[in-house]
UniProtKB/Swiss-Prot annotation:
This is U3 small nucleolar ribonucleoprotein protein IMP4. The lineage of its organism: Eukaryota, Fungi, Dikarya, Ascomycota, Saccharomycotina. Gene3D superfamilies: Probable brix-domain ribosomal biogenesis protein. One of its GO terms (biological process) is rRNA processing. PANTHER family: U3 SMALL NUCLEOLAR RIBONUCLEOPROTEIN PROTEIN IMP4. The gene is IMP4. Component of a heterotrimeric complex containing IMP3, IMP4 and MPP10. Component of the U3 small nucleolar ribonucleoprotein. Required for the early cleavages at sites A0, A1 and A2 during 18S ribosomal pre-RNA processing. Keywords: Nucleus, Ribonucleoprotein, Ribosome biogenesis, rRNA processing. It comes from the Eukaryota. It is found in: Nucleus, Nucleolus.
Amino acid sequence: MIRRQARERREYLYRKSLQLQEATKIQKRQQLKAALASGKPLPKDVADDEELRKTIAYDESVQDEIDDEYSAMSGITDPKVVVTTSRDPSTRLSQFAKEVKLLFPTSIRLNRGGTVLPSLVSACKTSASSDLIVLHEHRGVPTAMTVSHFPHGPTAYFSLHNVVLRHDLPDTGNMSEVHPHLIFDNFTTDLGKRVVQILKHLFPPGVKKDSARVITFANRGDFISVRQHVYVKTREGVELAEVGPRFEMRLYDLRLGTLENKDADVEWRMHGFMRTANKKDYL
């Protein structure tokens, strides 16, 4: 009996301490919000609370459709994607642009020529394009891809790695242009879900029951592996054949505006010290 009473007493004191800790956190959050609203300096105990600084949500409002740049077209209309390159592209980058164009069923490829970026963005907006993809290179090797959504963003900047074109793969044959099935694997964080939102809206919505084409975006350590396969059902099961292109992408910058807006708010950016922080995945 005495042991049980002592245990119940300890449990009561523990629950009471948790309630007091939570009440203290709520009070500090209210003080922080009041200070932010009034512009007054923070109390010292609140300003020095490192745990509060990590856990506080400065904006606890629920995201509505009005905050979603894709709500107007999501699941309703097919995207109009424009694929182009940096100016004066090499033969290999031009070939890669053709293959990227085939990757997205409703896209068109644009020979940029000497068009400057503001004029290119203006032309896309005038033609009611939904997205612009710009491919970049270094000495003939594709190195970067920029995806900008119209009319108000966001714009995602990816570095490209291990790019293998279709004609570098054996026995690829002709590429099917039917609407593909999409697989997004291992995107677990809010940033990862944001990247999925950007990528999936480059493809037409709807069910693709009769399509034998599959495009996979697999996140492994913040490197997004892009693979395209076609499958054939046999008596023994399902046979897969890779048809390319094949490459890895890594997000290094995400902005809320469109491509030509250099003053757009930065939603996320990879800093230099993040390259050595191998223990943390951001996607």
